[in-house]
């Protein structure tokens, strides 16, 4: 009997591995041109009752073996099996007690919060010297009379970044850092871009991303260099003004850090201070979502019978207000109307409203929050049916951030989702140029495929690559 069970387990493992390898080699993300479908009144040729064991990530494998051993299958927040994804563990819970820092610099937060890792870092002579140098520089910074002086004292130059990389390369082979990679770096999905690299390579790549991210904040919000989208993301002050120099002096003098700071903490704290004085905390607003705006919807996920719906969720792409007094624009309202109609037609059990504090710059209104209010007030859609994604600032990140919610909350990502927006927006989002834009701005395509099915809607599948945190975009990393 034991031999039969062992043979069965080996057969299951081998079969799943072969199936996954074959599918992985034959399936690639694509942007498809609009088809001939003109309405949403039909099932859209999307089979919704497929057995999940036939999907590309062989999701039933782990639980079938678990049940043979007399153990219950693991589940996600949505009540679905906790399927394994390459480079991501759906049971991993992100720790975001300081969300602006944590989402921009998750690696550095892990360094700070792990006492064993922190001690090992603080014992390296090269890193000790760097910490002392930057701490002394930060203490001198209030004496600066222009923004370039601050920058020269605090910025991490190329040789310094490489010197730290060398130290981390050496530390990566220690069991404490291997454990950090096993328990945090890899299962978090935050560094999924480097999933195929060794632990040491992932650690070094993540450090270089963090260093470039800190320097990027210094460039944009310290020196006033133009961000990619300058109309909405730029610095909030006239950097040549006496008022700004006074603010910098005062706030820099207030920066606190440990008596024996880690090598990155002086630069990190200065960068975070720049975001603070420019009122650029968008990345952390409403976090943790699952305990606030998304609490009701997340708690309801286990009640959803996913096979009763042709789509897993409906994504609504936000549209900013016309001025600082407009809570939701006519375009935004129209897009939300379409989503409500699809929801009431039972196309999906959830609506994800996506959009942050975007247009105009420093608007007091969050697109996603206003769309949620609109859905609840006009259509009486229950809060449990609406997930809020309140940070996206562009179409690229609308898709990326919605994918993150789906993977983090355990929404079945092997199923197709629906996106709705205005006609021209859907048209542009389903062209090949949209893939090019994503790769240029994000470094990857956050969608496995997208296909236009009507003038105002397209179906798509989210990509697990979306979990990667991007420190180059501090307002929505």
Annotate each language-model stretch with its function:
Residues 19-41:
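Signal peptide processing junction and immediate N-terminal pro/mature segment
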Residues 43, 48, 53-65, 70, ...:
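A structural signal for short, hydrophobic/glycine-enriched beta-strand patches
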Residues 16, 38, 77-78:
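Serine/threonine-rich, low-complexity intrinsically disordered segments
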Residues 1-7:
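Bacterial N-terminal signal peptides that target proteins for export
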Residues 9-16:
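Bacterial N-terminal signal peptides
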């Amino acid at each position: 009997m034991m031999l039969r069970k062992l043979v069965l387990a080996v057969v299951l493992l081998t079969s799943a591995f072969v199936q996954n390898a074959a599918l992985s080699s034959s399936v690639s993300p694509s942007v498809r041109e609009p088809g001939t479908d003109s309405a949403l009144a039909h099932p859209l040729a999307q089979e919704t009752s497929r057995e999940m064991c036939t999907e590309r990530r062989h999701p039933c494998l782990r639980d079938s073996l678990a049940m043979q051993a007399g153990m219950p299958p693991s589940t996600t927040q949505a009540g679905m099996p906790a399927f394994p994804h390459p480079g991501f563990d759906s049971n991993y819970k992100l720790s975001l007690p300081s969300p602006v820092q944590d989402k921009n610099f998750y690696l550095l937060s892990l360094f700070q919060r792990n006492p064993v890792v922190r001690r090992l870092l603080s014992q390296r002579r090269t890193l000790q010297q760097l910490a002392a140098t930057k701490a002394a520089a930060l203490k001198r910074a209030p004496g600066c009379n222009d923004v370039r002086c601050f920058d020269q004292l605090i910025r991490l130059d190329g040789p310094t970044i490489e010197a730290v990389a060398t130290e981390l390369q050496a530390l990566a082979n220690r069991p404490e850092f291997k454990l950090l990679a096993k328990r945090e770096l890899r299962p978090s999905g935050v560094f999924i871009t480097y999933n195929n690299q060794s632990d040491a390579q992932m650690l070094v790549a993540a450090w270089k991303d963090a260093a470039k991210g800190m320097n990027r904040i210094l460039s944009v919000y310290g020196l006033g260099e133009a961000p990619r989208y300058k109309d909405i993301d730029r610095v909030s002050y006239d950097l040549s003004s006496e008022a700004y120099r006074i603010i910098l002096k005062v706030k820099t003098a207030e920066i606190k850090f440990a008596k024996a700071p880690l090598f990155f903490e002086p630069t990190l704290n200065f960068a975070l201070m720049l975001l603070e004085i420019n009122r650029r905390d968008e990345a952390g607003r409403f976090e943790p979502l699952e305990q606030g705006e998304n609490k009701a919807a997340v708690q309801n996920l286990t009640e959803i019978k996913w096979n009763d719906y042709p789509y897993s969720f409906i994504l609504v792409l936000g549209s900013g207000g016309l001025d600082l007094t407009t809570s939701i624009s006519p375009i935004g309202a129209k897009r939300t109307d379409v989503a409500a109609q699809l929801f009431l037609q039972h196309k999906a059990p959830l609506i994800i409203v996506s959009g942050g504090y975007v247009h105009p710059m420093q608007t007091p209104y969050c697109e996603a929050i206003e769309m949620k209010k609109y859905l609840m007030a006009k259509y009486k859609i229950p809060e449990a049916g609406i997930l809020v994604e309140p940070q996206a600032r562009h179409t690229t990140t609308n898709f990326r951030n919605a994918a993150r919610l789906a993977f983090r909350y355990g929404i079945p990502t092997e199923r197709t989702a629906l996106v709705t927006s205005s006609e021209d927006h859907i048209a542009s989002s389903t062209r090949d140029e949209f893939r090019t834009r994503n790769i240029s701005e994000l470094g990857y395509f956050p969608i496995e495929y997208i296909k236009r099915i009507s003038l105002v809607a397209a179906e798509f599948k989210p990509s697990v690559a979306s979990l990667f945190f991007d420190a180059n975009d501090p307002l929505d990393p």
